[in-house]
Structures are given as structure tokens and as C-alpha cells.
Amino acid sequence: GEGAVYDIEEFVDSVAKIYHTPPPALKQDKLAFMAATADAQLLNYVAWPQATLHGGRGGKVIGFMMPKVSGKEPIHMIYSPAHRRQSYPHCAWDFLLYVARNIASSFATVHEHGHVVGDVNQNSFMVGRDSKVVLIDSDSFQINANGTLHLCEVGVSHFTPPELQTLSSFVGFERTENHDNFGLALLIFHVLFGGRHPYSGVPLISDAGNALETDIAHFRYAYASDNQRRGLKPPPRSIPLSMLPGDVEAMFQQAFTESGVATGRPTAKAWVAALDLLRQQLKKCTVSAMHVYPAHLTDCPWCALDNQGVIYFIDLGEEVITTSGDFVLAKVWAMVMASVAPPALQLPLPDHFQPTGRPLPLGLLRREYIILIEIALSALSLLLCGLQAEPRYIILVPVLSAIWIIGSLTSKAYKAEIQQRREAFNRAKMDYDHLVS
């Protein structure tokens, strides 16, 4: 990135972003204006500059202080079913609805101050377990400094509205709130529909579904009421749009089709109001407390998806029925995947061992030495007998026999010691192999 973020010992609730190289003069003016206009409302929803940092007194702006964002994760950890089941297993759809509402509120706060987010993408929104949303990377926002526009000149194609898909660059281009409102609607759709993209689905015409950017540019909203004409339909076993009340369905239709360009997309304030109202119109399924859905529906949509093997929410506290008629493999597997894995086993490293050698017992010679001594004494005795041929050398016969007997006994003791050590080594090796297998 263009800079690095550091903790500040004296201000534990703030961090400092320091640029690798001092930004241009216009960017310095932008940061100075943002720091001077910070207020409680902005700081509640945005990691907004609180003070500029300079290389010296009266020197160039080299960075800024901003609120520290802790205890929060990127928003995709919430709307991705797999990640949510792992990290937030007790969060049902009403939690997601509140997150979506808070996303809209963060946009509304920025817009009320005359600014535009510009580079809307999933990595710029952090969410906590209390559903609170904080926008980061605010120094890239399009800022209106008392009539002077500091443009946002970056963007992500998958969050770029259809009317801007043909732009080769955002350099010198002025964004509007209506452009932001496209990205806002897309984020809300992601959160409420399990991470699905509204322009991704099953192709109905030959050139649809090849590139997401192309489908966005052609307004191929897969969940539209006229999606047959547009060329895409929703993926199989996905959350149906009919889960939402008709007025919220219409808001998505307005946001993702041509009418949103012509007459404007739903504003952030409109989304806050609509989602707050929807939050008051929820009910729980009688089968699972985790199945929360809008009250206008007769049947539970989550149960219907469960029966298709698509598990969005897991009731970890329910009684598991194991009869063949009520067993759903996907549900059991989802519960398995939601469990927290034990920490990785810390294997002992060979370098950490400091073995100490154990010498042979006293008086126990190695077998090779015993054999050499026996051979040498035998050869000497035979030589003397052959040369002298005297009877007195006959006494060497029992001496040689004694040497052989002692050598044999010593050799057996040596073999037993070696066998004992070999067995100890094999046991240690088996224990180690079992540990690492």
C-alpha cells in the first residue's frame, strides 16, 4: 500500500498511518481538511483522520492519526456462509439484516457531510460481533472541501455501476452519490443473500455469464422480474428474492436496472428506513430458533433450503434427530464444519534434543577385541608348542580352553547389551513415528 499503520503508545485508541513518501500537495490539503472537520458522527462510522502528522514543525504532511479499528473483521467474514458458520455460528439472519442496515447508515453519514465513498468494495467495511460497521481507507474518499473536490481515482470493477464500466480509468472523474448507491445496494445484497452477486447466475443467452463486468454493463440482474429478457437467472438452490417484502424487492430492482441510472437508485437513508422497518417484521421458525425470516412468508425459507442440502444457519443447541426420515447429511456436515479445530500439534524438533551417550558397563569389552585377543593367544600357544615340543607346554591347553570360555561368556554379555540398546532405539523410533503420523 501507499503507507503503513502503527500503534501509538500515548493514544491507545488511535493509530497512525504514515505514507512511504509524502503525498502530493493536493492530498495534503485534503487530509488537513478532513482532520479539521472530523466530528462525532463521522468518527462513529468511519476511521476518519483526527489530526495530520508532519515531518517537522510546519513541514509536509506525512500521515495522520485516526481511530483504531479493533475487534472487527472484513465484511466478507460475515456474509460468506462458510466463514460465518465458523466465526459467528450463533448469528442468524436478523443479525445480517442489522449489519446491512449499519452499512447503509455509514454511507448516509458520509453523504450527509457532502462526500462520496467512491471506491466501494468489500475490503473497506469492518464488522464487529455487535453488528457495528466501520468504514476504513477514508483517505481515498472523494472529499468536497468547501467546493473544492478531491477526487477518488480508484475503484473495483465488480462494484462499479453499469454506466461506468466502460471507463478505462477514474483519474479526473467525479463520482456521485448515485454511483455510491449502486455499491451500497450490492453490499446489502451480498449480506442478505449469502454473498451472492446480483449479476451472477445461470446464463439464458449465449454471451451471458462470461464476464461479470460485461453482465453488469448490460444490466443483467439475475433476480430481476424480467430476467428472461436480460439473459441471467438466479443460481439453483440460492436464497429466493421473494423472501423479501415487495417494497424491498423493488428497491433492488431500481438499484440494479436501467431505471437506477435514469431516475436515481435508492439512497442510503432510504435503505436505513426500509431495513429498520423490516427488522420489526420478523418471526422465528418453530423448528429452529436460528431460522429468522420476514413475517409476510407463510413457510420458513431456511427449512426449504435445508431440505435441499443448503445450510445457511445452524442451531447448535437443538436436539439432533437420527431417524432416517429426518436425517439431513448436509446439516450434520455443516455442524461438523462449524466446530472449532484443535490447535496444531507442536512436534518436538530434533535440534531441541540433547542426548547423552551411555558407555558400556565396566569390564565389558567389545566383541571384536575379545576375538582378537583369543586369536592372538591361541596362535602364540600353538607356536610355542610346535617349536619346543616339550611336555611342559601341554599346560597351555587348559589355559586356552579357559580363555575361550571366558571370551564366549563376555561375548554373550556384549550381545545382550547391544540387543537391549537396539530394542530401546526401536521403541523410541516407533513412538516418534506414531507421534508424527
What is each stretch, according to the model?
Residues V287-P294, T298-S437:
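C-terminal or otherwise distal, non-catalytic regulatory regions appended to signaling enzyme catalytic cores
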Residues F107, H111-D130:
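Catalytic-loop of the protein kinase fold
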